[in-house]
A protein has these predicted regions:
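Intrinsically disordered, low-complexity regions enriched in polar/acidic and amide residues
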Residues: 1-3, 37-38
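Low-complexity, intrinsically disordered or signal/transmembrane-proximal segments
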Residues: 2-4, 8-12
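Catalytic cores of DNA base-excision repair glycosylases
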Residues: 3, 18-20
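Residue-identity detector for glycine
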Residues: 10, 17, 33-34
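Detector for intrinsically disordered, low-structure N-terminal pre-sequences
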Residues: 12-15, 24
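Active-site-proximal, substrate-binding regions of enzyme catalytic domains
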Residues: 21-351, 365-371, 376-416
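Conserved RecA-like ASCE P-loop NTPase motor core of nucleic-acid helicases/translocases
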Residues: 352-356
Length: 416
């Protein structure tokens, strides 16, 4: 059995976790209705094993550890929603204990890749946002630091008790039900729950500690077998340091959104687009906010994306009267993406993810990439948009680059 170690992350400690997969050699279609899966017309058996479990003597398969999955894209989401099977490429290390009768089986210690095909009948109401896109929760059950907010904790509390699905609950197949698996090696991190305020700003230290206490108790009651982080309350000094590191960024975003919120209501035609962009950048300068702040990029997307698909506008919810309450709600959603990206870029070894039920927030994440680059002037942030979130012609791209700096914003066309 592998000894569990503690890893330091900022002021806090995150426990390590690992999940082994027993998989057949060929591609499969994954089903949560039971242990049977469909593979070109013939059933196969797939199991999730914790790192100290052994392969059953009658099982024939390859055990994979250190499993990672290639993130899915916005295009993949649309295919999945249309009922099309979805292929996910996973890579893992062949572990001791693998048992297969096939003569060409991979060697112990080798790394192999396999493609698993998801059954579109499985619901994915809680979307796991990962570095580079999204994944169904099943691919984040081993060693992932999963941020959970108030809505997710409430859903877990309503669905589980004592590590089991509640009797009389929904019988539908949903990836969230996979949290019932005793082999789950990930960590649920309720930091977003603790930091969410209810007074149109980030909460004070006492509120953070109270909310963290509630979240930890609810998770322990619902899923006692799953690791949580932290295991106990932060001390006041640690909590104050965390709040202090986020307050300025959050407040700047709120001030900026209150200034520009009403101007985002109307559809901006192509002829008026450049003037609207220029006003947004001028508002950023007037409020003293960095053009690299996530709010600036998202407001530009809200002005530019089509009204048929505009997740930025749906998250910001512009209105004629856009006060502190509206700005807080929008900034909180964007702050979750900022928090996730900060952990991913500064502590990539913890494979941080955000579990959310907000599809518009998820679409934003799927349709943009927040990259950190190092230049002679220091570290900076670059936002790369999918074309559907910010469709521009070459001249408009040059105009934006003149406003923001050539390295601060870009876009990519959807894959064919």
């Amino acid at each position: 059995m592998q000894r569990q170690t503690d890893r330091h992350l900022g002021h806090y400690v995150v426990p390590a976790g690992r999940l082994n997969w027993l998989i057949p050699v060929l591609p499969i279609i994954l089903s949560l209705g039971g242990s049977e899966l469909q593979q070109t017309g013939s059933p196969v058996s797939v199991m999730l094993l914790s790192h100290n479990e052994v392969l059953p003597p009658d099982a024939d398969g390859v055990i994979l550890g250190e499993v990672t999955a290639k993130p899915l894209t916005l295009d993949d989401w649309f295919k999945y929603q249309k009922g099309q099977p979805l292929a996910v490429e996973i890579t893992g290390r062949v572990e001791e204990g693998s048992n297969t009768s096939k003569p060409d089986s991979p060697a112990i210690g080798s790394r192999i890749s396999r493609t698993l095909q998801l059954d579109p009948a499985i619901r994915n109401e809680s979307i796991c946002l990962v570095d580079g896109g999204w994944l169904p929760l099943i691919y984040c059950l081993g060693g992932t630091n999963i941020f959970v907010d108030r809505n997710i904790v409430a859903e877990i509390k309503a669905r589980f008790v004592g590590g089991k699905l509640k009797s009389g609950g929904t019988a539908e197949r949903d990836f969230l039900n996979m949290l019932e698996q005793k082999a789950c090696g990930s960590t649920l991190n309720p930091l977003p729950y603790a930091l969410e305020g209810n007074v149109q700003n980030l909460p004070d230290v006492d509120v953070v500690l109270d909310q963290l206490r509630i979240a930890l108790a609810d998770l322990a009651h619902a899923l006692p077998h799953i690791r949580v982080w932290p295991k106990s309350l932060y001390d006041r000094e640690q909590t104050q340091a965390t709040l202090g590191s986020y307050h300025a960024y959050f407040n700047q975003g709120m001030d900026f959104l209150q200034r520009v919120g009403p101007s985002l209501m109307a559809t901006t035609g192509k002829a008026k687009r450049r003037a609207a962009w220029a006003r947004i950048i001028q508002a950023a300068k007037d409020t003293g906010i960095s053009p690299q702040h996530i709010c600036v990029a998202i407001t530009l997307s809200a002005l530019t994306a089509s009204q048929q698909f505009n997740p930025a506008k749906n998250v910001l919810k512009p209105a004629a009267v856009y006060g502190a309450a509206q700005a807080y709600n929008a900034m909180w959603d964007l702050f979750l993406l900022f928090l996730l990206r900060q952990f991913q870029s500064q502590h990539s070894e913890y494979r941080s993810a955000l579990l959310t039920r907000d599809k518009n927030l998820a679409f934003l994440w799927m349709g943009m990439t927040i990259q950190r680059t190092v230049t002679e002037a220091g570290e900076k942030q670059q936002v790369v948009f999918d074309e559907r979130l910010m469709k521009c012609d070459p001249d408009e791209v040059e105009f934006l680059q003149a406003l923001l700096g050539a390295s601060n914003i870009g876009y990519e066309r959807p894959r064919a």
